[in-house]
Each structure stands twice: as structure tokens, then as C-alpha cells.
């Protein structure tokens, strides 16, 4: 026995060595399975549902790993040796592995255990993120740590021992350890001097921790201190003592304004907050101060004394609606760049007018002013007069103020203004404002309803990625989501320098004729999406000589009016137009037969009905041919079922990008791409392609990117991509591919930069050919270890293709099949000769004797004799056109054409009755020559003529042959009221079928009807009432 063991051990070692050699010869697996190696030494293990830290193989270049991300897994225990094998690790992300109960999506209890030397074993670690984990104490940390995040944990105590020795620490984040989503019975406790030993700490964030005082003895090196949304309602100079290096201080949300709170809120106590006049006076280096949501109703000028370097001041969500008309607190803030005063409204009040305090004029360095949500109804030159003298003001936000009267010409007086946002107001047109309107501190007030304070709707998807970005232009005016019904030239008087105008989401329903924008001679970008424009005039928009981008998307209402024509000839007159969007207008007919432009480079025509237009013969076949310089064309969501070669032939030859996403294309003539010699990008995602056949990509094509994702592709012809020598990016994701073959690509495979095959049901059989190919091009396959998954066999479904090495695995099913076949062959080889020799004649006699007694043998001859020419005789009232149409188009098609080899033979009066015979002879032959008689009825209350005669013959057959051959199909819901129908439903329910009026039920109806016509009604009778007719 010992000898056998000693002999087998070297043999097993030899087998293992051979297997290892085969593995190395077949190709190299991804180094960091199941994770993915990304640029700059990052190993990404996010969202892999890991329960432990993966230990990578010795062959992996572990020394090159500088960042490891294990976010959003299920790791509950960290061992001492988990990261010791990564000697160069600098960044480690472990967030969202074991969240506290309140933050868990399913509120499951969880606790993370960290062994003492887990992080000490990584002496190079610089950044550690333990946020969103249920840990109670700060673990032991290496001295090399620079950034530490312990936010949204259950750590409620910080003392000098917690962070001892972390002299290199510069960033410490401990937000959300005690608040309404992560509740606790106490506040975060920071012992005095607990952080004093962190001599290099520059960033400290303690937001959402129920703190009532500023932690004492903070390190003097702090530059950023974030204490917002705690309960600190008193601030004095000693609270921020020694923090002379502070650059950013956030103490907002500590004494909240609850009428505007989007989450649970505690009202600020009366006569609070209390800020000492000298609270910030010693912070001479302060650049950013946040006092938002602090229930401030006035500003003390001494608060800002000594803050000569202040650049950003956030005073939003307070009660400063009157203060900003009188305050002198801004006089010394000469370096202020950004000021936020949004949502400083008086509860339930809208002021008639607002005049800013003269002290705003001293903000000579101000670049951005946010004043949305203050609620005043008129805007004129007196409103913003102090701002007109500010040379550096670039951005002014005035949205959501209920402004209904606005003099837009006042912005000409602002020398450096680049962006004005007046969206989400109630501006309805040009207005003449008087100078006697009420002021914010004592004028006319309108009480608001609660619904008026609802947030603005989120923008729907538009052509933002299509048109040029207005941020690069000199002056932009946003008037979207107002109450504009018409556009008048007077609105834009003195705005000739305006370059970008947004008028989307209004109610503009006029016919533009070339006079609406006359003053805007410098306009380059015009957004008129989500309106109701009538494009009828030939000279629309021709008053804009510099217009480059025009967005007319989502103006579908005029195009839906029957009989009204629409004129696109204005496009030819816009000599500088380069970008045009006509998307989502449901354009389908009665428009210009051709678009013409020599300057247009990009056209968005998605969301229309081009499939209907091209179905109208040659009327719109040349619709895009006049766009001689077009480069980018989007025809997505145009209900295209086919794309014929002559259609591509009539597209502009200059096209480089063609998008055909989300149509109904089931096939594509790939050879027709040679009609577009400059095409580089083709997007066919979201169609109904079943296979990539019909030839291959043509030779000489310049196609660089092809997207056929989200189709139903299950087959690709060999060599399909091989002729496209310049193809570099190919997206085959979300299809029905079971393999990926090297023969599809040929020599092109090595040149691919992106090959996306994720979300395909790959068949992970042993020796799968696609494994070797994907390993060859693994650098081009995004998410290869985690996103490329098996679809079959069942035990590997949904798992990574690397769940086991498919090149070396043993196919158990095949092994069992081979064993069974070999066993059967041996048994037959031994048994058959032996039985033949011993009792051959007896076996032959018994075989034929049993064969003669088999039941089906006796029935076969009778069945041939009783064979009938038809399976069913269909009887219906021909005078009812709807019933006749249903029979000929629906019933006949489903039973004779759609059932394949199981098709039924129907007898129809107008098709199968023999001429020359009498009506009764044909009727008799049809009833007695069919297995069933099918009555199709719209109503059952009045049955006569052929229907009545056929029913009487069927009943006669019941009496003579004792065979019930009646099957009823009732098309109207009222038909079931007949007493006969109700009685028959009770006795033989499956022979009475009701046509479903919901499409979802029609498939079941045809299945039930097929069963009723192929089986004897005797089997359908309810045995509780009767046994049904039986033959004697």
C-alpha cells in the first residue's frame, strides 16, 4: 500500500506540472482576477459582491499596484494579512461594505471587524477611506497616512489616542456620524486637544454630527474647517482661536430655516444665532465663509472686519430680504469674487420691487452674484443699479423670483457681464415699468400659496451635447421656463451684443417671420426648444446674420395639426448656420421636400417619423441631399423599419457621423456603406438586428467606430469586420452572442482599441474558443474580469467567464454521456450474441406477437378509413364585414399559416364549396366532412340563415354519430348573455371561446382554440354535470 502511494505522488506532481505548462501556453489570464487593472496602477474591485479581500496570484505585478478600490462589496472582516502582499499600496477605498443600519438600503444590521495590524502592514499607505461602514473606533493606522475618511460610521469619540502618531495627516473627514439618517443617542465628542498632535492637518470636516460647540484646541495649521449642519448656535472669537491660517470656514445650517428645508429640520431657537462681532476678525487669511441656512435676518458689518482676502461668501437660505436693500456690511469686501444670496425670501410674500443697497457697489472684484429665490416681481434699472459699476461682474443669477416685468435692456450697462439667468420666472413679454413701484422694505406685497414655492422641473433630455456650449461666448441670457407666448423685438432692445439666448420651455406659439429678433445682430446660439413654434415663413430667423446654432426641438404641436404645411426653406437663407436641431417634433408629412444648406455641419433629426416620410415613394427620398457640407446626422427614434441602399445613396457624401439608434431596423445592407465614403462613426444601437450577415463591411470604408449594442445579434459571419481596416472601436454589448470568434475580425483584431462584449449570454463550455481570443485582446475589452459574464450553462449563469478556467475544466455531462455509451456498447456486445444463441426464435415470436396486440396498430386502419378532408368548417355571417374580415385575416392566418407543421385545414364557404352543387349539398358535405364546426358570432340573440342551418346539421350529427362537434367563438362581450351559451359554458367550457380585447390575451386565445379544434369535445365536459356524448 505504501509503495502505491509513493508511486502515485510523483505522477500527480507530473500531471499538475503539465496542466500548468498548458495554462501558460494557452495565454495569460488577467493578472488581478476577479478585479480589473486600470491605468495608473489602480485595481478596481467595486461592486463585485466580494466577502473577503482578494489575494492576487504571485504572477501578478503586485508591486505596481498603488491604488485598490473595494467599494460597495460585502467585506465584514479585515485580516492582518489582507493588504500585506501589496508593498506599494498608497490609496485604499473600503467604503460601503458594511453600512450602519440607518444607511443600509434594507436596514440590515452589520458590524465590521478590523484586526489590529490590518493597515499597519501597509507602511506606504497615504489615503484610506472607511466611510459608510459600521465601525465604532478608529483602527490602528500607519504613520504614512495623509488622508483619512471616517464619514458615516458609528465613531462617536475622538481623543488624543485615536489618531496618535499620524503626524503626516493632512485631511480628516468625519461627516454624518450622528444625524437623522445615521441616528445616535449623543453627539460626536471631540476631546479638547484631541487633534492638537496633528501638526500638518489642513482639512477637517465634521458636518452632520450634532455638535453644539466648536471643538477646542484645534491645530493651528488648519486651512479648511467644515462644521455645517450641526447645532452650534453661538460663535465667539475664542471658538476659532489660534486658527489664523484658516482659508475656508463653513458653519452653515447650524440654526436652520425650516420652511425651506428638504430634509428633517429643527427650528432655530428664538434670538439665535448669536455671532459675536469679532468672531471672524482675526481670520485675516479667510477666503471662503459659509453662513447659509443660519436664520440670519441682518448683517453686522463688524463680522467682516479684517476679512480683506474674502473671495467667496455664502449667505443663502436666510431672512435677508430687507437687509440687502439697506446693509453696509459689504463695503470692505473689495476682494469678494462670489456672493450667494439665494432664497432669502420672506415667508409667503412676493415683493413688488427690489432695490439693492448702495454697499453692493463696493464689491469691485465681484464676478458672480446669485439672487435666485428672493421673490420680487419687477426688474428695472433701479433694481441692480449698484451692480452696474462693477467692472468684473460676469454671472448674475435671478431665476425663481416670480419676475413678471423685466427691462432686459438694462444689462447693456454692465461692462463685463457674460451670463444672466432669468429662468423659472413669469416673464410674458416686453414691459414698460414705472418708477413708482413698491420697494422690498415697505411696498406692495403679494402673499404666495405653498405651491408657488415648489422646485422647478428638471430639464428633459435635449440637444445640449449637440449645440455649441454657451459658456465660451461673451454674453448669454437665459429666459427658459417663463410665460412667453410671443417674441417681440422690443424685448431685446439694446441687446445687440447678446450671443446666446435660451427661450426653451415657454409657450411661444407664434409663426416666426424674420422680425422677432431684429435687435440681436450678434446672436450666435438660439434655443427655442419645448415651445409651439409655427415654421411657415421662408425668411424665419434671417434677421440673425451671425446665427450658428439653432435648437427647434420639442416643438411638435404644430407638426401634429392635420392639413397644415411647414416650410424649411429658411435653412437655406441662414448662411452661417452650422448646428440645427429639429429633434422630437414628430415630423411626418407636409413639410418641405428637401433641406438645403451649404454651411450646416450638424443636424439632429431624432424623434421624428422619417420611416413614414420615406414610405411615401420618392417624395422625401432627397430630403437631406441638399446639405452638402453635413458632417453629423442623428436619425435616432425615427420609426425606421428598413434602410434601403437608395436611401443611403441620397444622404450627403460628406457625412462622418451617422446615428440610427432606437429604430426598428431588422437588417442592414452593409455593402451600401460605400455610398458614404467619409463615414467614420455608425451607431445602430437599440435596433432589432438578429445577425451580422448580408456580406461584410465593405473594403475601403473609413469606419472607425461601430456601435451595434442592444440588438438581438446571435450570429456574426466569418470575416465580417476584417475588411474595415480603420475600425478601432466596436460595441457588441447587450446582444444574444454565445461566443466571440477570432474569424470575425481576421488581422484587424490586434488593431482594435475597444471591443465591448459585455451583457451577452456567452456559452461557457469547456474549451470555449472565445476565451483564448478575449485573452489575446484583453487590453481592448472593457470590464473583462467583471462585466463579461456567462449566459450558460445554468451553474455559471451570471458569473464571470473567469469563474473557472474554461480551457482546462472537465465537462461532467460529456463524461457521463461517454461512460453511458461505452457501457451500453459493452452490454450490447455481450448480451445480443448470447441471447441470439440461447433463445433467438422465442424472442422473434414474442416480438411479433406483441406487435400484433399493440392498440395503435388496431386503430391505424380505422383512422385512415375515417380520415376527413377538413379539421374545421368555419360558419359566420358574411353580411357583417367586421366578422368576415376577422375570419379571413386573423383566424385563417393564425390557424393555416402560423402553425407550421401543425397547421389546420379549414373549410370556408367562398373558397372551398364546389360550384354546381346546391347550397344544402355543400353545407352537408362541409359539416360531415370536418372534424369540428366552428361558429364565429358577433351576437347570439339573432341567429338565422346559414348559421341556423349549420347549427341544426351539427346537432343532427350529434344525434346520429353521438359526436359533439360544435365550437363557439364569440367576438362581442354581449354574446355571453345567451342562455344556450351560458349552459354550454357550464357543461363544456373549453368549446366556448371569447375573443380577448387586450392584446396580451390573444396569444392564449389562439392556443385554446387550437386545442379545442384538435381534441374531442368529450374530454372537455364537466364531469360534475354529465359525461358527455359517447359512442354506443
Swiss-Prot record:
Ranges: LRR repeats: 62-85, 87-110, 122-147, 150-166, 167-190, 198-221, 223-242, 243-268, 283-306, 308-332, 333-356, 363-386, 390-413, 415-440, 470-494, 496-519, 520-543, 545-572, 574-598, 600-622, 627-650, 652-675, 676-699, 701-723, 724-747, 749-772
Extracellular-side positions: 26-818
Record carries keyword Lipoprotein: yes
Cited Pfam families: LRR_12, LRR_6, LRR_8, TIR
Organism domain of life: Eukaryota
Cysteines engaged in disulfide bonds, as pairs: 35-45, 98-110, 178-184, 255-268, 258-265, 470-500, 764-790, 766-809
Primary site of residence: endoplasmic reticulum
Gene3D superfamilies to which the protein is assigned, alphabetical: Ribonuclease Inhibitor, Toll/interleukin-1 receptor homology (TIR) domain
Residue positions with a glycan: 64, 129, 200, 210, 242, 300, 340, 469, 474, 513, 567, 694, 731
KW Cell inner membrane (keyword) present: no
GO biological process, one term: positive regulation of intestinal epithelial cell development
Record-annotated membrane-spanning stretches: 819-839
Lipid attachment locations (S-palmitoyl cysteine): 258, 265
Gene Ontology CC: apical plasma membrane; basolateral plasma membrane; cytoplasm; early endosome membrane; early phagosome; endolysosome; endolysosome membrane; endoplasmic reticulum
Compartments reported by the entry: Endoplasmic reticulum membrane; Early endosome membrane; Lysosome; Cytoplasmic vesicle, Phagosome
One term of GO molecular function: unmethylated CpG binding
PTMs per UniProt: Activated by proteolytic cleavage of the flexible loop between repeats LRR14 and LRR15 within the ectodomain. Cleavage requires UNC93B1. Proteolytically processed by first removing the majority of the ectodomain by either asparagine endopeptidase (AEP) or a cathepsin followed by a trimming event that is solely cathepsin mediated and required for optimal receptor signaling.
Limits of the TIR domain: 868-1013
Tissue-by-tissue expression: Highly expressed in spleen, lymph node, tonsil and peripheral blood leukocytes, especially in plasmacytoid pre-dendritic cells. Levels are much lower in monocytes and CD11c+ immature dendritic cells. Also detected in lung and liver.
Entry's family note: Belongs to the Toll-like receptor family.
Described purpose of this protein according to its UniProt entry: Key component of innate and adaptive immunity. TLRs (Toll-like receptors) control host immune response against pathogens through recognition of molecular patterns specific to microorganisms. TLR9 is a nucleotide-sensing TLR which is activated by unmethylated cytidine-phosphate-guanosine (CpG) dinucleotides. Acts via MYD88 and TRAF6, leading to NF-kappa-B activation, cytokine secretion and the inflammatory response. Controls lymphocyte response to Helicobacter infection. Upon CpG stimulation, induces B-cell proliferation, activation, survival and antibody production.
Subunit structure: Monomer and homodimer. Exists as a monomer in the absence of unmethylated cytidine-phosphate-guanosine (CpG) ligand. Proteolytic processing of an insertion loop (Z-loop) is required for homodimerization upon binding to the unmethylated CpG ligand leading to its activation. Interacts with MYD88 via their respective TIR domains. Interacts with BTK. Interacts (via transmembrane domain) with UNC93B1. Interacts with CD300LH; the interaction may promote full activation of TLR9-triggered innate responses.
Protein's recorded name: Toll-like receptor 9
Organism in which the protein naturally occurs: Homo sapiens (Human)
Amino acid at each position: 500500500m505504501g509503495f502505491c502511494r509513493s508511486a502515485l505522488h510523483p505522477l500527480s506532481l507530473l500531471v499538475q506540472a503539465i496542466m500548468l505548462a498548458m495554462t501558460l501556453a494557452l495565454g495569460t489570464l488577467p493578472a488581478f482576477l476577479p478585479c480589473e487593472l486600470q491605468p495608473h496602477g489602480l485595481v478596481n474591485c467595486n461592486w463585485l459582491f466580494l466577502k473577503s479581500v482578494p489575494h492576487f496570484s504571485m504572477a501578478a505585478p503586485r508591486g505596481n499596484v498603488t491604488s485598490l478600490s473595494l467599494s460597495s462589496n460585502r467585506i465584514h472582516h479585515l485580516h492582518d494579512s489582507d493588504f500585506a502582499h501589496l508593498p506599494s499600496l498608497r490609496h485604499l477605498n473600503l467604503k460601503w461594505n458594511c453600512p450602519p443600519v440607518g444607511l443600509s438600503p434594507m436596514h440590515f444590521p452589520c458590524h465590521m471587524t478590523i484586526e489590529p495590524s490590518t493597515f499597519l502592514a501597509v507602511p506606504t499607505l497615504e489615503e484610506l477611506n472607511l466611510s459608510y461602514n459600521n465601525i465604532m473606533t478608529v483602527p490602528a493606522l500607519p504613520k504614512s497616512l495623509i488622508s483619512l475618511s471616517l464619514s458615516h460610521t458609528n465613531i462617536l469619540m475622538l481623543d488624543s489616542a485615536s489618531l496618535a502618531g499620524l503626524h503626516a495627516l493632512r485631511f480628516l473627514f468625519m461627516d454624518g456620524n450622528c444625524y437623522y439618517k445615521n441616528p445616535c443617542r449623543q453627539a460626536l465628542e471631540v476631546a479638547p486637544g484631541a487633534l492638537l498632535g496633528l501638526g500638518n492637518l489642513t482639512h477637517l470636516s465634521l458636518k452632520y454630527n450634532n455638535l453644539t460647540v466648536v471643538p477646542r484646541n484645534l491645530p493651528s495649521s488648519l486651512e479648511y474647517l467644515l462644521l455645517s449642519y450641526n447645532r452650534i448656535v453661538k460663535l465667539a472669537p475664542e471658538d476659532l482661536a489660534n486658527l489664523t491660517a484658516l482659508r475656508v470656514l463653513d458653519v452653515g445650517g447650524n440654526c436652520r430655516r425650516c420652511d425651506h428645508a428638504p430634509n428633517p429640520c429643527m427650528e432655530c431657537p428664538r434670538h439665535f444665532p448669536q455671532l459675536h462681532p469679532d468672531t471672524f476678525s482675526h481670520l485675516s487669511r479667510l477666503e471662503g465663509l459659509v453662513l447659509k441656512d443660519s436664520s440670519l435676518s441682518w448683517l453686522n458689518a463688524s463680522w467682516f472686519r479684517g476679512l480683506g482676502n474674502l473671495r467667496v461668501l455664502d449667505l443663502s437660505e436666510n431672512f435677508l430680504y430687507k437687509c440687502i436693500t439697506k446693509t453696509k456690511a459689504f463695503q470692505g469686501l473689495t476682494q469678494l469674487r462670489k456672493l450667494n444670496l439665494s432664497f432669502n425670501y420672506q415667508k409667503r410674500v412676493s415683493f413688488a420691487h427690489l432695490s439693492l443697497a448702495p454697499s453692493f457697489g463696493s464689491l469691485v472684484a465681484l464676478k458672480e452674484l446669485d439672487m435666485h429665490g428672493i421673490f420680487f416681481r419687477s426688474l428695472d434699472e433701479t433694481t441692480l443699479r449698484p451692480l452696474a459699476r462693477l467692472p468684473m461682474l460676469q454671472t448674475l443669477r435671478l431665476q425663481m423670483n416670480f419676475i413678471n416685468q423685466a427691462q432686459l435692456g438694462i444689462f447693456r450697462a454692465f461692462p463685463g457681464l457674460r451670463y444672466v439667468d432669468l429662468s423659472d420666472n413669469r416673464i410674458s413679454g416686453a414691459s414698460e415699468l414705472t418708477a413708482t413701484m413698491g420697494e422690498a422694505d415697505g411696498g406692495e406685497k403679494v402673499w404666495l400659496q405653498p405651491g408657488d414655492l415648489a422646485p422647478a422641473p428638471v430639464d428633459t433630455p435635449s440637444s445640449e451635447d449637440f449645440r455649441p456650449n454657451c459658456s465660451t461666448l461673451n454674453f448669454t441670457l437665459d429666459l427658459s421656463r417663463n410665460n412667453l407666448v410671443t417674441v417681440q423685438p422690443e424685448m431685446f432692445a439694446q441687446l445687440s451684443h447678446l450671443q446666446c439666448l435660451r427661450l426653451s420651455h415657454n409657450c411661444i406659439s407664434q409663426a416666426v417671420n424674420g422680425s422677432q429678433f431684429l435687435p440681436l445682430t450678434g446672436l450666435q446660439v438660439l434655443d427655442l426648444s419645448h415651445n409651439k413654434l409655427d415654421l411657415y415663413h421662408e425668411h424665419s430667423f434671417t434677421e440673425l446674420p451671425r446665427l450658428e446654432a439653432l435648437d427647434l426641438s420639442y416643438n411638435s404641436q404644430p407638426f401634429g395639426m392635420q392639413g397644415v404645411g411647414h416650410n424649411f426653406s429658411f435653412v437655406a437663407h441662414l448662411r452661417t448656420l452650422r448646428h440645427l436641431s429639429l429633434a422630437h417634433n414628430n415630423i411626418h408629412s407636409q413639410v418641405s421636400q428637401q433641406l438645403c444648406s451649404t454651411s450646416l455641419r450638424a443636424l439632429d433629426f431624432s424623434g421624428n417619423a422619417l420611416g413614414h416620410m420615406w414610405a411615401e415613394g420618392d417624395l422625401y427620398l432627397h430630403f437631406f441631399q441638399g446639405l452638402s457640407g453635413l458632417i453629423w446626422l442623428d436619425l435616432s427614434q425615427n420609426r425606421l423599419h428598413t434602410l434601403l441602399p437608395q436611401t443611403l445613396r441620397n444622404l450627403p457624401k460628406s457625412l462622418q457621423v451617422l446615428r440610427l439608434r432606437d429604430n426598428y431596423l431588422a437588417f442592414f445592407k452593409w455593402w451600401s456603406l460605400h455610398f458614404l465614403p467619409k463615414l467614420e462613426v455608425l451607431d445602430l444601437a437599440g435596433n432589432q438586428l438578429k445577425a451580422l450577415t448580408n456580406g461584410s463591411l465593405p473594403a475601403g470604408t473609413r469606419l472607425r467606430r461601430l456601435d451595434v449594442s442592444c440588438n438581438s445579434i446571435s450570429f456574426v459571419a466569418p470575416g465580417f469586420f476584417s475588411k474595415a481596416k480603420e475600425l478601432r472601436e466596436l460595441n457588441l454589448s447587450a446582444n444574444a452572442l454565445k461566443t466571440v470568434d477570432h474569424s470575425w475580425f481576421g488581422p484587424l483584431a490586434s488593431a482594435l482599441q475597444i471591443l465591448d462584449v459585455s451583457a451577452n449570454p456567452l456559452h461557457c463550455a469547456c474549451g470555449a474558443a472565445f476565451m483564448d481570443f478575449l485573452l489575446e485582446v484583453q487590453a481592448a475589452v472593457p470590464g473583462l474580469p467583471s462585466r463579461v459574464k456567462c449566459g450558460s450553462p445554468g451553474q455559471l449563469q451570471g458569473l464571470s467567464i473567469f469563474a473557472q478556467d474554461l480551457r482546462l475544466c472537465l465537462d461532467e455531462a460529456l463524461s457521463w454521456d461517454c461512460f453511458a455509451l461505452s457501457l451500453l456498447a459493452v452490454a450490447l456486445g455481450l448480451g445480443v450474441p448470447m441471447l441470439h444463441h440461447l433463445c433467438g426464435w422465442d424472442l422473434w415470436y414474442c416480438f411479433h406477437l406483441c406487435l400484433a396486440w399493440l392498440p395503435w396498430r388496431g386503430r391505424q386502419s380505422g383512422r385512415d378509413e375515417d380520415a376527413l378532408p377538413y379539421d374545421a368548417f368555419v360558419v359566420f355571417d358574411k353580411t357583417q364585414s367586421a366578422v368576415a374580415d376577422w375570419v379571413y385575416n386573423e383566424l385563417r392566418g393564425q390557424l393555416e399559416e402560423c402553425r407550421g407543421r401543425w397547421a389546420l385545414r379549414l373549410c370556408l364557404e367562398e373558397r372551398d364549396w364546389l360550384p354546381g352543387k346546391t347550397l344544402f349539398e355543400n353545407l352537408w358535405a362541409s359539416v360531415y366532412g370536418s372534424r369540428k364546426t366552428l361558429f364565429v358570432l358577433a351576437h347570439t340573440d339573432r341567429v338565422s340563415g346559414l348559421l341556423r342551418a349549420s347549427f341544426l346539421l351539427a346537432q343532427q350529427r350529434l344525434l346520429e354519430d353521438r359526436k359533439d362537434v360544435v365550437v363557439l367563438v364569440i367576438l362581442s362581450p354581449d354574446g355571453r348573455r345567451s342562455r344556450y351559451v351560458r349552459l354550454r359554458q357550464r357543461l363544456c367550457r373549453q368549446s366556448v371561446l371569447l375573443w380577448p380585447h387586450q392584446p396580451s390575451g390573444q396569444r392564449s386565445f389562439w392556443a385554446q382554440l387550437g386545442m379545442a379544434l384538435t381534441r374531442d369535445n368529450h374530454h372537455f365536459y364537466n364531469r360534475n354535470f354529465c359525461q358527455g356524448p359517447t359512442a354506443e
